[in-house]
Amino acid sequence: MNYTTQMDAARKGLVTKEMEAVARKEGMDIEILRERVATGKIAIPANKNHHSLDAEGIGEGLRTKINVNLGISKDCPNIEVELDKVRTALEMKAEAIMDLSSFGKTEEFRKSLIEMSPAMIGTVPIYDAVGFYDKELQDITAQEFIDVVEKHAKEGVDFVTIHAGMNQETAAVFKRNPRLTNIVSRGGSLLYAWMELNKKENPFYQYYDQLLEICEKYDVTISLGDACRPGSIHDATDASQIKELMVLGELTLRAWEKNVQVMIEGPGHMAIDEIAANMVLEKKLCHGAPFYVLGPIVTDIAPGYDHITSAIGGAIAASHGADFLCYVTPAEHLRLPTLEDMKEGIIASKIAAHAGDIAKKVPGARKWDNEMSRARQQLNWEKMFELAIDPEKARRYREESKPEHDDSCTMCGKMCSMRNMNKIMEGKNINILREDD
């Protein structure tokens, strides 16, 4: 039996090789997985032309996944530098990479990325439009925006961020409800500017059905972008954000009618006490579609440390139902991330995702922690390094500060609680001041 997309196959009762791969990785019953793909609760971004893909699932009952943003820009156009980041992201087992390239040899970089990456690849096609057409924003036609999406889809991109919820109604709500930081989504601000300059409807909203035809043809998952995501905790959960979320819910149903998989993008900057409610709102208004959040960043005062503010928010968001975390690096709000910035962002995001999985009782999530605790109890340093989320750093810290005795560290020495409890439980003397027999 033929099928067009993962959702189409699932609705026809078919199990694809991508579904089998996801079920195996997650330890989920294949029929439960297939049913959740059929109803849109799980998305498996898997473009038919991405031949190196090792498919992952995003959504209900699955591990929280993380995405890494990278790409070339006018100020940093070196492709090799970004490809080094790609290789590192893959080594660190990021499940997704988004190419946010906006200038230079974007097509060359994107094709290299798709060819080499087993991780799912996402793009924001509007970023590429200005450079691709070599036109000022207001001179790009609606059809040209759509054509860039098709170009990315043909090349093998697994998911595309489309800010279709910023229509004239959403724009009117934004105008009536002033914000401290206006529109901070790059793609959203570009579309809003295009709409204002041309006095026209958002082309991604007006020609949404055409976009869905493209996504269905190549099995591209549509990641509905949040143009009105809050860029400060002051603007969180305001009228513009919620109005757009309601539109995204309507667009979700239209996509599912065409068997196109959907993810919903979310905040953004948000105080801790608003995060749980926002997860409920998205799942309710967008019919249980997977939720993909940037952070949330829980305070605005920490430039240089936003991988931490983001990890705090990401852990809370994941514990309350977010399915996919976009990493944030220490360079957020300051510069294009370096390779080291990227590593720190990945680690912080992976910690947040795992902490969320423990809280929402994803099967097997606690096993890793229990194994680490057992290794600590046994003072098995090699096992601890092997299990660490960042083995290199854990090993380096111990080697930089060697203890006198191998069964302790330089923090506690022979007063180590693990060491002493092990000895006492075995009926031995702890010998803090004397050498062991």
UniProtKB/Swiss-Prot annotation:
Pathway noted in the entry: Cofactor biosynthesis; thiamine diphosphate biosynthesis
Q: Which Gene3D superfamilies match?
A: 6.10.250.620, Radical SAM ThiC family, central domain
One Gene Ontology term of the molecular function aspect: 4 iron, 4 sulfur cluster binding
Q: Which domain of life is it from?
A: Bacteria
Task: Cite a single GO BP annotation.
Answer: thiamine biosynthetic process
Q: Name one GO cellular component term.
A: cytosol
Alphabetized, the UniProt keywords read: 4Fe-4S, Iron, Iron-sulfur, Lyase, Metal-binding, S-adenosyl-L-methionine, Thiamine biosynthesis, Zinc
- As recorded in UniProt, its EC number(s) are 4.1.99.17
Cofactor binding annotation: Binds 1 [4Fe-4S] cluster per subunit. The cluster is coordinated with 3 cysteines and an exchangeable S-adenosyl-L-methionine.
Which reaction is recorded as catalysed by this protein? 5-amino-1-(5-phospho-beta-D-ribosyl)imidazole + S-adenosyl-L-methionine = 4-amino-2-methyl-5-(phosphooxymethyl)pyrimidine + CO + 5'-deoxyadenosine + formate + L-methionine + 3 H(+)
Q: Where does Zn(2+) bind?
A: H269, H333
Which InterPro entries has this protein been placed in? ThiC, ThiC/Bza_core_dom, ThiC/BzaA/B
Binding site residues for [4Fe-4S] cluster: C409, C412, C416
* Cofactor(s) it depends on: [4Fe-4S] cluster
Pfam families for this protein:
ThiC_Rad_SAM
The record's function comment reads:
Catalyzes the synthesis of the hydroxymethylpyrimidine phosphate (HMP-P) moiety of thiamine from aminoimidazole ribotide (AIR) in a radical S-adenosyl-L-methionine (SAM)-dependent reaction.
> Which HAMAP family does this UniProt record tie to the protein?
ThiC
User: What is stated as this protein's family in its record?
Assistant: Belongs to the ThiC family.
Q: What is this protein called?
A: Phosphomethylpyrimidine synthase
Organism (species): Alkaliphilus metalliredigens (strain QYMF)
Lineage per the UniProt record? Bacteria, Bacillati, Bacillota, Clostridia, Peptostreptococcales
